[in-house]
A protein has these predicted regions:
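Bacterial N-terminal signal peptides
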Residues: 7-18
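Extracellular/periplasmic carbohydrate-active domains that bind, remodel
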Residues: 19-433
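Positively charged n-region of N-terminal signal peptides that target proteins for export
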Residues: 1-4
């Protein structure tokens, strides 16, 4: 409640200070066109009370019609419903520009989209794009999500803040977001997606920061994400529907970020992963999760794969668990689950974490929930320091490598295993060879 009140006060102060006199002209950094389109020239008021949806949409449309360029949002508070960006467009938010989501659900039209891993009818995002290329949202402004009735946000799903579908060459940089109720940023089926120097804040369950969904070539760089759910979640759909599409999330780099979750995890991989997740590197990040720092997860009936996950130079602080592996998790099931004694389980291999510092962590690794019918193949943990109460628990994993694990404060054994094969199992503290 305190966070919500403070957020409201900050928003009011921000709107009071963002008067037209403080307007700043920006040039496009997209390098595609020097055209510029000021939303005030299209009738936007920026007074925080008048709905500026139509005016801003006209500016965005004019940008596309004229071959691309920059849509300038000067200082002010712009109350808007859903708007759609097109190709070759930069949306430039002035430092004191605030986009405020309309509290009226009717301002977010119903469309088809993916929600919790399956296609369904959803409300269109506050800012969306589909099958667009070379789009950017830049600048030091802020985007505030709408305040809506939570009971009406699931069927159909309510609007997320930014949702980009089948887009290429996307840049999100420099702005901040705040939303109480749903995901903030959801790239779906995108290629060459970059999020840099963003400040993302959410509060409630389902308040994920960035949900990377069946995307490839992704960079999340120098972002500060503090959420009520997963700070970053990597997904690729669930069930046979996603397996048939065969569109994994792959080639993802997360670096130099602060990831904080007040309810779940700093980084979640799965459980919606039937299309596969591979080639993920997270490095030089500070992570604090209410349940887990990093959570690799799946369920029966998901199939798919998770492979080539690397974490290096991470600080995990105030988390019950540094790393949790739960591939038999219970919960929401796909409407068309993958069947077969072995095939129903995710294929997981090549998980590696090196040079990790843990502080005030209750359990180092919780890795016993792995199906015996499909063991993890390849798990490396080296160079772990800090303090924790409970050590490492592993089950049904082959090709394990443990070395240089030196933590203090243990109240039991450093390592407990069941059906585990590899090196360093007898002395995990020994230096790596």
């Amino acid at each position: 409640m305190t966070r919500r009140i403070l957020s409201g006060i900050l928003l009011i102060l921000s709107c009071l200070s963002s008067l037209p006199a403080a307007e700043t002209n920006f040039m496009s950094s997209a390098g595609m066109s020097t055209n510029s389109f000021n939303v005030r020239d299209f009738g936007a008021k920026g007074d925080g009370q008048t709905k500026d949806t139509a005016a801003i949409q006209k500016a965005l449309d004019a940008c596309v019609t004229n071959g691309g360029g920059t849509v300038i949002v000067p200082a002010g508070c712009y109350l808007i419903g859903s708007v759609v960006m097109g190709s070759n467009t930069t949306l430039q938010l002035a430092h004191a520009a605030n986009l405020l989501g309309s509290p009226d659900l009717v301002d977010y039209p119903l469309v088809r989209g993916r929600w919790e891993g399956e296609f369904a009818e959803i409300h269109r995002a506050l800012i969306s794009a589909e099958k667009a290329g070379h789009i950017s949202i830049l600048g030091g402004g802020s985007i505030f999500g709408p305040s809506l009735n939570l009971s009406r946000l699931r069927n159909p799903r309510g609007p997320v803040l930014i949702e980009l579908t089948e887009c290429t060459n996307v840049m999100l940089e420099g702005f901040s977001t705040q939303y109480q109720q749903l995901w903030s940023i959801h790239p779906l089926f995108c290629q060459n997606f970059t999020a840099r120097n963003l400040i993302i804040r959410t509060i409630n369950t389902n308040g994920d920061g960035i949900d990377v969904d069946s995307c490839r070539d992704v960079l999340i760089d120098h972002c500060s994400i503090d959420t009520g759910d997963d700070a970053i979640s990597l997904k690729s759909g669930r069930g046979l529907e996603a397996m048939r599409l065969g569109r994994p999330t792959e080639n993802v780099v997360i670096r130099d970020c602060t990831l904080i979750s007040s309810l779940f995890g700093g980084l979640g991989i799965g459980t919606e992963m039937s299309g596969g997740i591979r080639n993920v590197r997270i490095e030089n990040c500070f992570i604090s999760g209410h349940q887990n720092g990093i959570f690799i997860k799946s369920r029966d009936g998901r199939g798919g794969f998770i492979e080539n996950i690397i974490g290096e130079n991470l600080i995990i602080n105030n988390s019950p668990t540094f790393l949790a592996l739960d591939l038999v998790k219970k919960g929401i099931q796909a409407s068309d689950p993958v069947t077969g004694q072995v095939e129903q389980w995710a294929r997981v291999k090549n998980i590696s974490f090196n040079h990790i510092q843990v502080y005030n962590v209750m359990e180092l690794v919780a890795g016993k929930n792995v199906p015996a019918d499909r063991p993890i193949d390849g798990f490396t943990l080296t160079g772990i320091t800090g303090n924790c109460e409970k050590g490492i628990t592993l089950a049904n994993i082959v090709n394990v490598k443990l070395a240089g694990i030196n933590v203090t404060g243990l109240e039991g054994p450093l390592l407990t295993t069941n059906k585990v094969q590899g090196t360093g199992l007898n002395n995990p503290s020994a230096p790596a060879k």
